[in-house]
A protein has these predicted regions:
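Conserved catalytic core of Hanks-type protein kinase domains
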Residues: 9, 88, 241, 283, ...
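Sequence-specific dsDNA recognition surfaces
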Residues: 153-160, 175-191, 205-237, 257, ...
Length: 407
């Protein structure tokens, strides 16, 4: 049998399905023994046709491999471009800065430092309003104003090891704009998305791949555990506190919410004061933001890292004027929307290449890939000759050499 033909047919969907049907599994690993292999029936064309099929498969796969390699090169280039856009955005190089525009137009502007002071005032006001509402709901009147002394001013954090920023920008700890972090709970659920009228719990994978995915939710069956205050709402900023080292800290803005789904213990909601969530999103996704998350995440195993709320608040980010945040975010969206379109096209074409590879193999073993030659030696004659050779030269197990002492 032609070696290339055997290798190709062994990789075909028909043979793979037969093997999986006869194989046994242990801990998710498929195992087949020699008897199973001997029972697998293979289509056997004439030897000359096997060679023609092998040549044609090789030719078409070479073209297909070149196409896949080209698509993956573009994919890698888009990944680098995405990173460069985010880097330029966080360094003030993507759009004219507010300082440049103000100087050109002869006007003043609110600097990042002034914005930070305003954020701290707003942060405290929101905290006090939230605490007063909680006491009201609990039926506890705030007679003693001493409860306000429980407010903790956010730490500034050390920034001397960070690079210089454009005029009008300032470094800030994430503790400044975050006035509250909300977390849900973990409990047993049905492993399927909730149906209409049911309530779900968000899984880590719902925030892993760039946008909020409502399909990645579990269904809560215990109505006593449903907490409407923990439901994801449109505009929520969601953050994954636990995942692999490359995925921990992934975050999304919940743009569209059509299902009832609660926060889990691993998916946090940030409540922000005077910070554009779009700006926070792009800074945390940038190289500098990812470096901060890796610096602060804990855990000994690469497969699972965690970043607690206290450490989240220590993340340092650049803070430009609020008008500049909006302009940068809009420009990043404009550029990355093109990237996402191209990435989607590449993903579609890679899937098409995978299907085409299987289609080539299927056609090959249905006798439709190359023309058949009536002058070829019939496969039945070839098979009879193979059986005769096997009967005349029965295989014998090789004798094992005895092991010597010290081997």
């Amino acid at each position: 049998m032609e070696a290339r033909f055997l290798a190709a047919i062994w990789d075909s969907p028909t043979v793979r399905e037969k093997l999986e049907q006869t194989a046994r599994t242990t801990a998710g690993i498929f195992k087949v023994n020699q008897q199973d292999l001997n029972r697998v029936a293979l289509p056997l064309p004439p030897l000359a046709e096997q060679r023609r099929i092998g040549d044609e498969i090789e030719k078409q796969f070479t073209r297909l491999d070149a196409a896949v390699a080209g698509l993956k090169r573009i994919q890698a280039s888009l990944k680098r471009y995405r990173a460069s856009v985010l880097k330029a955005a966080c360094e003030g190089r993507l759009v004219p800065t507010e300082a440049e525009l103000a100087r050109r137009e002869g006007r003043g502007y609110e600097t990042g430092e002034q914005l930070l002071k305003r954020i701290l005032v707003e942060r405290r006001a929101r905290w006090e309003a939230d605490q007063a509402e909680r006491m009201k709901v609990a039926g506890k009147a705030a007679k003693d104003p001493g409860w306000k002394s429980r407010y903790e001013e956010p730490a500034v954090g050390e920034t001397s090891d960070l690079g210089a920023l454009p005029a009008g920008w300032v470094w800030a700890a994430l503790s400044a704009p975050i006035w509250d972090i909300e977390a849900g709970r973990s409990f047993r659920c049905l492993e399927r998305p909730p149906l209409p009228g049911e309530t779900g719990v968000v899984k880590v994978s719902a925030v892993t791949w760039g946008s909020y995915d409502e399909e990645e939710t579990k269904t809560c069956t215990d109505l006593d555990r449903v907490d409407n205050s923990l439901l994801v709402r449109p505009g929520d900023f969601l953050f994954s506190r636990a995942n692999t080292i490359d995925l921990v800290g992934n975050c999304v803005i919940a743009r569209q919410v059509t299902r009832r789904a609660m926060l889990s213990d691993k998916i946090l909601r940030f409540r922000l004061a005077l910070l554009a969530p779009e700006w926070l999103l792009l800074t945390l996704r940038s190289g500098q933001g990812r470096a901060e998350i890796r610096r602060l995440a804990t855990g000994n195993q690469e497969s699972m890292r965690n970043i607690g709320q206290d450490r989240i608040r220590q993340i340092r980010l650049p803070l430009p004027p609020i008008a500049e945040q909006a302009r940068i975010s809009a420009e990043v969206d404009r550029r990355l929307s093109v990237v996402e379109e191209l990435e989607s096209t590449i993903h579609t074409n890679l899937a098409r290449c995978a299907r085409l590879r299987q289609s080539i193999l299927k056609r090959a073993f249905e006798g439709k890939l190359v023309p058949q030659d009536p002058n070829d030696e019939p496969a039945s004659v070839l098979l009879a000759r193979l059986r005769k050779e096997r009967d005349e030269n029965p295989g014998r197990p090789a004798k094992r050499k005895p092991r010597r002492a010290g081997d």
